[in-house]
UniProtKB/Swiss-Prot annotation:
Protein name, as recorded: UDP-N-acetylenolpyruvoylglucosamine reductase 2
Lineage of the organism: Bacteria, Bacillati, Bacillota, Bacilli, Bacillales
Listed cofactors: FAD
Limits of the FAD-binding PCMH-type domain: 33-197
Gene label: murB2
PANTHER family from the UniProt entry: UDP-N-ACETYLENOLPYRUVOYLGLUCOSAMINE REDUCTASE
Its biological purpose: Cell wall formation.
Length: 305
């Protein structure tokens, strides 16, 4: 279908300024790479998301969903069809020890809201840069905590635009993975069950984790966080470091000198630079240690022609 027609129709469904053509997706990822989206939409509520899905299904238009772009590499050729950004779906409510957070809310912000209400259980998330939806998608975690420990249920939208509530068991959580990598559900909101705590103790733990993160991670450059999952009984960063790869650069992207598990965009790097460096690191580590590093970061989109 003609993308101009798609743009014109969706412009009648969403608020002014929330539908764009040929939007550069590097403006919507933490690592500042990514080509153009044919049509880019940023819904403000669930009804608008449903309208987009039903329209796309009617005309067989591919749809790609983005959170805040913290753990994704979008290829330099961009994304065909409709790209849906969920960054405006950000509501958070607190009732007793329960927090309900919508998909586009930053998980860091949710952890801070928990602190404000003297609730403990989300301290580990105080330095995770992703959205709530992204955190559920990959079962994000840090410093001994992970999303699956505090999630009780979530509201999702099916590929047909229907709303469903799923309990935690349906998520099939594992280490940095969930069922959402294999189905077409869109995570809309999450319900977290926390415990009452002491403000000063919660804040002290968050301050400690923030200090550790800032002292060990290369926050001065754009990055997608940990590139690889932790291999069994080992650490990706340790294997990369011992392979002599810190400082290895392809194009504008290099293996961080501060933390070998990170790849940073130091000089206008491209998605292809990232992909080539990832493959080089995987090949080198496997040749040296016999360990296959599995990507944690998602790669989506089309190659540049």
């Amino acid at each position: 279908m003609n993308m101009q027609e798609v743009y014109e129709y969706l412009s009648t469904v969403l608020p002014e300024g929330h539908v764009k053509q040929d939007e550069m997706l590097k403006n919507h990822t933490h690592i500042k790479v990514g080509g153009k989206a044919d049509v880019f939409v940023a819904p403000t509520n669930y009804d608008e998301i449903q309208e987009v899905i039903k329209y796309a299904n009617k005309y067989n238009i591919p749809v790609t969903f983005l959170g805040n772009g913290s753990n994704v590499i979008i290829k330099d050729g961009g994304i065909r069809g409709i790209t849906v950004s969920l960054i405006h779906i950000t509501g958070v409510t607190v009732t007793g020890t329960t927090i309900v957070a919508q998909c586009g809310a930053a998980i860091i912000d949710v952890s801070r809201i928990a602190l404000e209400h003297n609730l403990t259980g989300l301290e580990f998330a105080c330095g995770i840069p992703g959205s709530v939806g992204g955190a559920l998608y990959m079962n994000a975690g840090a410093y001994g905590g992970e999303i699956s420990y505090v999630l009780t249920e979530a509201v999702v939208m099916t590929g047909d635009g229907e709303l469903r509530t799923l309990t935690k068991e349906a998520f099939e959580f594992g280490y940095r993975k969930s069922v959402f990598a294999n189905n077409h559900y869109i995570i809309l909101e999450a319900r977290f069950e926390l415990e009452e705590g002491v403000y000063e103790e919660i804040k002290a733990k968050m301050d400690d984790l923030t200090f550790k993160r800032e002292s060990k991670q290369p926050l001065e450059y754009p990055s997608c966080g940990s590139v690889f999952k932790r291999p069994p009984n080992n650490f990706a960063g340790k294997l990369i470091q011992e392979s002599g790869l810190q400082g290895k650069r392809i194009g504008g992207v290099e293996v961080s000198l501060k933390h070998a598990g990170f790849m940073v965009n130091v000089d206008n790097g491209t998605a292809q630079d990232y992909i080539d460096l990832i493959h080089f690191v995987q090949k080198t580590v496997e040749e040296k240690f016999g360990v296959k590093l599995e990507r944690e970061v998602r790669i989506i989109g089309e190659d540049k022609e």
